């Protein structure tokens, strides 16, 4: 009986999710399929996916600082960002459910049964603006209450580089877990390396497992922290012109033993960094052969006319990421479909 109830609930949720499909979803599916016919790494991003991409690259957003998830028909608080408006209010707890959202001067909107991304879109907004949430506390028989929060710019620290120190025998080993090559990564790593130096670690491990890449510029600058100077990657455009991206500052921020952890989900910028460390003999690469993405994509908003003038008065059209270049290792090899082999 319990299994039947579980399956019935899941099927109902799947049917409801399909019924909530809108024209933007259909257009996005069609455009994505078209883009993938051009090459495997060319993508169309819907307006919401474009916003998500920008958030991941900048590690910041404007909102209330809460991670939400669906719980049957309810939008539930899964976690809160420390120091964010939701956490600071102390009026919201993990497990509470959001049943209504209201903007300043507008009526409360009932969001029970709504898609999660639609609820999120209502809650997010410019910093300094206010949003009213109708909260149904966790548990049975609870009564709703209204909580007013002022939106702020939130830095997503959980997606930034994380530092830890492990003790192995008598040695201290520093570990830097890098989930993505976001803008500002290299500066963050510099700070963490200084902390590790103060703790007298004997070696450093850089964990790039499940790191799908990010900004090419960050891959180059991060590599420069561990080599004196020299080329990091070669980039060839569609005209056959080759550009060399190099580290030129002559400064090494960490000179000790270095290990880079990779797996089959380490891709793009992760592969550039791992390949450079391998080609310079600077680090031991440990793990699985990487994904094998050796191309560079350019990001462009579809709200720009002729790629120049931004037209904010147009409805949001999303963006495209299209392949413009192919990159090569310092030794001249390509990672496309080959990856980096430990």
Regions found by a protein language model. Give the residues of each.
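Short, mixed charged/polar active-site loops
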Residues: 141-146, 317-319, 334
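Short acidic, Pro/Gly- and aromatic-enriched capping/linker segments at domain boundaries
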Residues: 310, 314-327
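Structural motif
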Residues: 95-97, 333
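Short beta-strand or tight-loop elements
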Residues: 62-64, 129, 318-320
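Conserved functional hotspot residues or short segments at active or partner-binding sites
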Residues: 1-9, 328-342
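Cleft-lining beta-strand/loop regions that shape enzyme active-site pockets
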Residues: 19-22, 45-61, 70-88, 94, ...
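Extended, domain-scale alpha-helical bundle/helix-rich regions
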Residues: 1-63, 67-72
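Pro/Ser/Thr/Gly-rich intrinsically disordered low-complexity regions
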Residues: 293, 314, 321, 336-342
């Amino acid at each position: 009986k319990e299994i039947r109830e579980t399956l019935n609930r899941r099927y109902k949720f799947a049917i409801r999710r399909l019924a909530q499909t809108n024209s933007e979803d259909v257009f996005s599916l069609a455009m994505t399929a078209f883009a993938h016919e051009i090459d495997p790494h060319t993508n169309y991003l819907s307006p919401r996916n474009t916003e998500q991409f920008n958030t991941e690259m900048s590690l910041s957003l404007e909102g209330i600082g809460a991670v939400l998830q669906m719980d049957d028909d309810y939008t539930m608080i899964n976690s809160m960002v420390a120091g964010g408006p939701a956490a600071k209010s102390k009026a919201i707890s993990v497990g509470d459910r959001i049943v209504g959202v209201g903007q300043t001067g507008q009526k409360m909107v009932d969001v029970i049964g709504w898609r999660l991304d639609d609820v999120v879109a209502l809650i997010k907004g410019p910093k300094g603006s206010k949003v009213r949430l109708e909260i149904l506390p966790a548990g049975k028989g609870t009564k709703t209450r209204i909580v007013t929060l002022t939106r702020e710019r939130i830095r997503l620290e959980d997606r930034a580089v994380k530092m830890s120190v492990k003790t192995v025998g008598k040695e201290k080993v520093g570990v830097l877990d890098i989930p993505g090559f976001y803008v500002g990564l290299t500066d963050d790593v510099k700070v963490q390396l200084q902390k590790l130096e103060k703790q007298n670690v004997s070696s450093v491990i850089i964990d790039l497992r499940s790191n799908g890449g990010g900004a090419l510029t960050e891959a180059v600058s991060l590599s420069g922290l561990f080599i004196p100077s020299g080329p990091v990657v070669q980039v060839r455009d569609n005209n056959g012109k080759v550009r060399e991206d190099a580290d030129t500052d002559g400064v090494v921020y960490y000179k000790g033993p270095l290990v880079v952890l990779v797996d089959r989900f380490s891709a793009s910028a992760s592969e550039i960094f791992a390949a450079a460390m391998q080609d310079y003999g600077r680090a031991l690469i440990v793990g699985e052969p990487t994904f094998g993405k050796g191309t560079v994509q350019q990001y462009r908003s579809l709200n720009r006319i002729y790629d120049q003038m931004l037209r904010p008065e147009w409805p949001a059209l999303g963006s495209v990421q299209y392949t413009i270049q192919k990159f090569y290792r310092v030794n001249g090899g390509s990672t496309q479909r080959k990856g980096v082999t430990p």
